[in-house]
Amino acid sequence: MINVLLVDDHELVRAGIRRILEDIKGIKVVGEASCGEDAVKWCRANAVDVVLMDMSMPGIGGLEATRKIARSTADVKIIMLTVHTENPLPAKVMQAGAAGYLSKGAAPQEVVSAIRSVYSGQRYIASDIAQQMALSQIEPEKTESPFASLSERELQIMLMITKGQKVNEISEQLNLSPKTVNSYRYRMFSKLNIHGDVELTHLAIRHGLCNAETLSSQ
């Protein structure tokens, strides 16, 4: 039996995935979490084989949760299931320790196939995302996102900023000082040749890394 943990801040999304998996032989949803922090705690305290992880959630988010789970419970396989499929996120997520990467638009059978594949020790990346990653290696000048220059920590903080989170919130959730968070912010601004959080969010929207409605919280 493959024990699966569902991690998404939208209850309807979790309910939909649970419904898909509940009739699949050999797969059992054993728990749910609505944020990255709870997912990390759940994996440390319970027996779970595969985590279906959302990227954008309150708190530390899916990228940092993936990194923490991969470091502390290496036998747990993580599949990022997200609307964010543009470079450089897939590569960054896989580098953080994920075993799979799927779009939330994936067919139910592909989700099942991904769970079984990563449980057996393989990696699973949706074909369209894998093609995009391959093209970025072959023709980087045509496909590379400006965000590819960011470190994993900078990318994580960028995603939190685009969700409208403030420096004090980010510093508390990541156990960093506000000064350190601001250092990352200014480094990002320099790399991306921008001058503030709103401009950062506009750039992220243009490259498919966040949704336009996030601007309302800026």
UniProtKB/Swiss-Prot annotation:
The HTH luxR-type domain extends over 143-208
Q: Where is the Response regulatory domain?
A: 3-119
Q: Which residues carry this modification: 4-aspartylphosphate?
A: D54
State any GO CC term. Answer: cytoplasm
Q: Which residues bind DNA?
A: 167-186
Q: Enumerate the UniProt keywords alphabetically.
A: Cytoplasm, DNA-binding, Phosphoprotein, Transcription, Transcription regulation, Two-component regulatory system
Post-translational modification comment from the UniProt entry: Phosphorylated and activated by BarA.
Record flagged with keyword Protein transport = no
**One GO MF term attached to the UniProt entry:** DNA binding
Q: Which Pfam families match?
A: GerE, Response_reg
Role according to the record:
Member of the two-component regulatory system UvrY/BarA involved in the regulation of carbon metabolism via the CsrA/CsrB regulatory system. UvrY activates the transcription of the untranslated csrB RNA and of barA, in an autoregulatory loop. Mediates the effects of CsrA on csrB RNA by BarA-dependent and BarA-independent mechanisms.
Question: What is the protein named?
Answer: Response regulator UvrY
